[in-house]
């Protein structure tokens, strides 16, 4: 078992390093690689969600292909809209896809059509929309130029993941050392207040480094972003734990050796991304 634990640790480490390298590389390389990567991630995560609820939720049978296409298309549509390559007409096929999801249940004679609707729509709101909103972070309209020019700023979407990774790592280390008070025992027995606060401090600390190198936001705006990401990331993590608890599964999938599934890896970002978008819009209103 000692050997097994070690090989599992090595497997986890290799997967973790590759995962971070691919994510960081694709976000930084070009807006095109960013788009391709997250269309694939959206599709895989939604497919995994569909597989999970089909296997584990009573009488549920969602159309994995359609919800997967929906998530991928929503990402593309929001991207096209954000880079000014398309106007709002680009969302019409998506609306038709949602209508198809509703109407098809009339004819499919499945066991539990209402739950199929519910889980299908949830896949779009809970997974499709947050990933699509990454485009709002990544692309910026420059109204000052006479041509409508859109610039790609990889640092904002990347910073979300940096804050989440650092806060996770910090929470794990600090929680293991001094964690006494349980954060949310009913849903996630391992998390401690000490770990979560420690992880938050690590992430906010890193925001000062980002503020130094990328001064398009002030130090306090960066720190606020880190705080929002950490708090909502924790809720995102707990939300997915609640989902898995209700479905009686330990991991959402097996695609990542030693790391469970796609949902396990992106659970915290699914709430952190929309929260970050709202926070950054709020800064422009103040």
Cite the ranges covered by each PLM segment:
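Membrane-embedded alpha-helical bundles of polytopic integral membrane proteins
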Residues: 1-228
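Juxtamembrane interface at the ends
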Residues: 171-172, 176-177, 241-249
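Short, conserved aromatic-histidine micro-motifs
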Residues: 220-224, 259-260, 266, 285-286
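Interfacial loop-to-transmembrane junctions
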Residues: 246-269
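Juxtamembrane boundary at the C-terminal end of a transmembrane helix
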Residues: 278-286
């Amino acid at each position: 078992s000692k050997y097994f634990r070690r090989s599992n640790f090595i497997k986890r480490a290799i997967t973790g390093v590759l995962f971070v390298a691919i994510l960081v590389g694709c976000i930084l390389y070009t807006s095109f690689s960013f788009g391709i990567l997250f269309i694939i991630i959206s599709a895989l995560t939604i497919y995994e969600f569909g597989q999970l609820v089909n296997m584990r939720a009573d009488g549920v049978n969602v159309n994995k292909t359609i919800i997967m296409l929906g998530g991928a298309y929503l990402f593309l549509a929001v991207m096209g809209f954000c880079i000014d390559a398309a106007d709002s007409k680009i969302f019409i096929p998506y609306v038709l896809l949602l209508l198809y999801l509703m109407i098809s249940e009339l004819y499919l004679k499945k066991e539990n059509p209402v739950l199929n609707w519910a889980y299908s729509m949830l896949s779009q709101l809970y997974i499709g929309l947050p990933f699509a909103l990454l485009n709002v972070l990544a692309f910026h309209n420059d109204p000052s130029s006479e041509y409508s020019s859109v610039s790609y700023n990889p640092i904002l979407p990347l910073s979300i993941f940096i804050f989440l990774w650092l806060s996770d790592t910090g929470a794990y280390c600090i929680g293991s050392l001094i964690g006494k008070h349980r954060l949310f025992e009913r849903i996630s027995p391992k998390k401690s207040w000490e770990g979560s606060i420690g992880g938050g401090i690590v992430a906010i600390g890193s925001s000062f480094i980002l503020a130094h190198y990328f001064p398009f936001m002030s130090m306090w705006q960066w720190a606020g972003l880190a705080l929002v990401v950490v708090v909502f990331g924790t809720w995102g993590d707990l939300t997915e734990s609640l989902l898995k608890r209700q479905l009686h599964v330990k991991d959402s999938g097996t695609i990542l050796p030693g790391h469970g599934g796609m949902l396990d890896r992106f659970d915290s970002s699914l709430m952190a991304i929309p929260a970050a978008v709202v926070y950054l819009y709020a800064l422009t209103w103040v």
